[in-house]
Amino acid sequence: MSVKPLIILPDPVLRQVSKPVERFDDQLRKFASDMFDTMYDAPGIGLAAIQVGEPIRMLVIDLAKEGEPKAPHIFVNPTIVQSSDKRSTYEEGCLSIPDYYAEVERPATVKVNYFDADGKPQSMEADGLMATCLQHEIDHLNGVLFIDHISKLKRDMVIKKFKKLASQRASKKVL
């Protein structure tokens, strides 16, 4: 088990656009396993590679509830190829923005093309929480955070709070 440190707002790494994965090998599968370990440890239901400092287009999701068998999904180079006009709203949070939640409206259903960890092309049609989670994590791969979907006033308040916390953490390290 290898838990990676999470990148936390306001770290500019979170705004990077991730590069496509070109090699599907044991190293990629090991990294996916580490991502699951990190996500489960946090705990969370989704994690993009950029959130652990790797700017590659890969994400992991597991929506299994506590007490249910794990249901891990690996998405490499995912692309939303279709989304519904119908919208749904979910309260979202993010491992990179701890303890902050906000309602975000997104397309209710999406179709995503992606590769599995072995490089085999896959496609998934998703609705509900899976659709929301896929859009949230794919946003990360494009340098977009869920707070970018809320009002500027709320977003600015969140960023200010996390900049202050980062400054406090940095000053403690200096001591």
UniProtKB/Swiss-Prot annotation:
Short name of any one Pfam family annotated for the protein: Pep_deformylase
Binding site for Fe cation: C94, H136, H140
Biological process, per Gene Ontology: co-translational protein modification; translation
Xref: Gene3D superfamilies: Peptide deformylase (3.90.45.10)
Swiss-Prot/TrEMBL catalytic activity: N-terminal N-formyl-L-methionyl-[peptide] + H2O = N-terminal L-methionyl-[peptide] + formate
Functional description taken from the UniProt entry: Removes the formyl group from the N-terminal Met of newly synthesized proteins. Requires at least a dipeptide for an efficient rate of reaction. N-terminal L-methionine is a prerequisite for activity but the enzyme has broad specificity at other positions.
Protein's UniProt name: Peptide deformylase
Lineage: Bacteria, Pseudomonadati, Pseudomonadota, Alphaproteobacteria, Hyphomicrobiales
